[in-house]
Regions:
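Extended hydrophobic/aromatic segments used for targeting, binding, or gating
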Residues: 100-136, 146-149
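Transmembrane beta-strands of outer-membrane beta-barrel pores
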Residues: 26-30, 82, 93-97, 145-149
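Flexible loop and strand-edge segments within Gram-negative outer membrane beta-barrel domains
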Residues: 19, 24-69, 110, 114-118, ...
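Outer-membrane beta-barrel translocator domains and adjoining extracellular loop/strand segments
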Residues: 1, 33-39, 100-108
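Non-catalytic interaction/regulatory modules that flank or connect domains
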Residues: 68-114
Length: 149
C-alpha cells in the first residue's frame, strides 16, 4: 500500500475584529487487492459436479485488484466580530478521485470483473449571524447549502 498526504492550516488576523482561517489538505491512497476467495456455487447446486471445485477456499485471481483514491479538501472561515454580534462565513471545497478494480469471480479464469470510478466535486457554504456570548439572551440564525457535480 502506498499512502501519503498533508495539511496546511493558516490563520490571519488583519484587524482586531476580523479573522480568516484557511485550511488545505490532500490524501492519497493506492492499495493492492483484497484477499477474497471463491466459496463455491450457491446452495441447492450440485457441489460434487462443481466446475471450479479445486478453487473453493483459495485466493485465485487472474487480474490484479486495486483501489486508488485522491482526496483534496480546502476551506475558508471568515469571522467578523462586531460590538453586539458575530458574523461567520465558512466555504468548503472537496474533490474526490476514486478508482476500484476487482476480479469478482475470485477464480483464475476471466468471468467477471468490475471497475468503479468516482469523480466528485462538492462546494459548501454556511453563513451564521449570532449574538455575543456575554448577553443574557443569545440567538443565532443562518443559512447553509452545498452543490455537487
Amino acid at each position: 500500500m502506498e499512502a501519503g498526504g498533508g495539511r496546511i492550516h493558516a490563520i490571519w488576523l488583519p484587524s482586531e475584529n476580523l479573522k480568516l482561517d484557511f485550511t488545505i489538505g490532500y490524501d492519497y491512497n493506492d492499495e493492492g487487492g483484497y484477499p477474497y476467495y471463491y466459496t463455491g456455487a450457491i446452495d441447492g447446486y450440485d457441489k460434487e459436479n462443481e466446475k471450479y471445485k479445486n478453487y473453493i477456499g483459495k485466493i485465485s485471481y487472474d487480474q490484479d485488484c486495486t483501489y486508488r483514491r485522491g482526496l483534496f479538501n480546502t476551506g475558508l472561515n471568515i469571522e467578523y466580530q462586531a460590538q453586539k454580534f458575530i458574523l461567520s462565513a465558512v466555504t468548503g471545497f472537496q474533490n474526490l478521485n476514486d478508482r476500484m478494480f476487482m476480479d469478482q469471480d475470485f477464480l483464475p479464469v476471466s468471468i467477471y470483473t468490475i471497475e468503479q470510478k468516482q469523480r466528485l466535486n462538492t462546494i459548501s457554504e454556511e453563513i451564521t449571524f449570532k449574538s455575543k456570548n456575554n448577553k443574557r439572551w443569545q440567538w443565532v440564525t443562518g443559512v447553509s447549502g452545498f452543490y455537487q457535480w
